[in-house]
Swiss-Prot record:
Protein known as: Uncharacterized protein YfjT
Encoding gene (name): yfjT
Coiled coil ranges: 34-61
Source organism (scientific name): Bacillus subtilis (strain 168)
InterPro entries for the chain: YfjT-like
UniProt keyword list: Coiled coil
Domain of life: Bacteria
Length: 61
């Protein structure tokens, strides 16, 4: 998805940006038209974000 994120500040910014993108996706969903595939996509986005956080967290130790 672009350049490597190597230092803690860049990693935190990356996580914030991904969380912001997630929130934008949620805000754009129509509750009446949302289906299981949309929910699965949200869960997948959260799983990816959590995996990236865990990877970064190891760098911070």
């Amino acid at each position: 998805m672009g350049n490597a994120v190597n230092n803690k500040d860049q990693q935190i910014d990356y996580l914030k940006n991904r969380l912001d993108m997630f929130m934008n996706v949620i805000d754009s969903l129509d509750p009446e038209a949302t289906d299981v595939e949309d929910i699965d996509r949200l869960i997948s986005m959260l799983d990816d974000l959590e995996a990236k956080y865990e990877r970064f967290k190891k760098d911070w130790e």
